[in-house]
């Protein structure tokens, strides 16, 4: 699902002219990615004096990492950001994947948390919940048959592609008239709380988003590994570890794991 949506997230439209014809007149609009507004000079997250990946022990950052964008700690050992076009593409992919990962991590943990506190709504373990659609009775959203009773995986896939693709297409295209300049931070209807109204606060929120997003991507990777190795959800694994940390830890599972058992 994420792959289908990410296919719609390409920045290839940025910088290209879009022409619309009304009657005999022609209106041409050009959308280009906006350069971020400079953060406050005292911000520790931007500029040449920003915090680097190893603090005072960090070496000189590459010349192309200037601290202009959020999450730039001056570390690029593989030189992945040396090419400006590649950097722009990877930056967009990272932000989008970060947002997906934050939503996914919450979705993995929250149902288990509710179930462990007495809330009954069907299967709570994230990697088992979706498989209920293949059962004879199908899948009830939140365990309630009066909400959405799903019986076709193809129907769910089609609905998600249409709805999520429409939102992503709207974001990338800059709205119906191309008025949104930066597809990564479109604002407007995507910012109903007005969090981007203050430029300095918005610059700091961008840093918080990318930092939490990177942690969430690592978390999701850990959840996948746990599901394969233990066959349990993240909270159940945490409870097992706290109850018996000697026998329930990464090292113990890594040295005793046998695929298929």
Swiss-Prot record:
Residues bound to chlorophyll b 4: 160, 171
Keyword Magnesium part of the UniProt annotation: yes
InterPro entries: Chloro_AB-bd_pln, Chloroa_b-bind
Domain of life where this protein originates: Eukaryota
Residue positions binding chlorophyll b 3: 152, 168
Binding site for chlorophyll b 1: 53
Sites bearing N2-acetylarginine, chain numbering: 30
Any single biological process term in GO: photosynthesis, light harvesting in photosystem I
Pfam family, one: Chloroa_b-bind
Residues that, per the record, bind chlorophyll a 2: 97
Keywords linked to the UniProt accession: Acetylation, Chlorophyll, Chloroplast, Chromophore, Magnesium, Membrane, Metal-binding, Phosphoprotein, Photosynthesis, Photosystem I, Photosystem II, Plastid, Thylakoid, Transit peptide, Transmembrane, Transmembrane helix
Record-listed chlorophyll a 4 binding positions: 212
Binding residue positions for chlorophyll a 5: 208, 226
Positions with a binding annotation for chlorophyll a 3: 132, 142, 209
Gene3D superfamilies for the chain: Chlorophyll a/b binding protein domain (1.10.3460.10)
Regions crossing the membrane: 95-115, 147-167, 215-235
Membrane topology field: Multi-pass membrane protein
A GO molecular-function descriptor: chlorophyll binding
Cellular-component GO terms for this entry: chloroplast thylakoid membrane; photosystem I; photosystem II
Function in brief: The light-harvesting complex (LHC) functions as a light receptor, it captures and delivers excitation energy to photosystems with which it is closely associated.
Quaternary structure, from the entry: The LHC complex consists of chlorophyll a-b binding proteins.
Domain remark text: The N-terminus of the protein extends into the stroma where it is involved with adhesion of granal membranes and post-translational modifications; both are believed to mediate the distribution of excitation energy between photosystems I and II.
Protein name per UniProt: Chlorophyll a-b binding protein 2, chloroplastic
Organism per entry: Oryza sativa subsp. japonica (Rice)
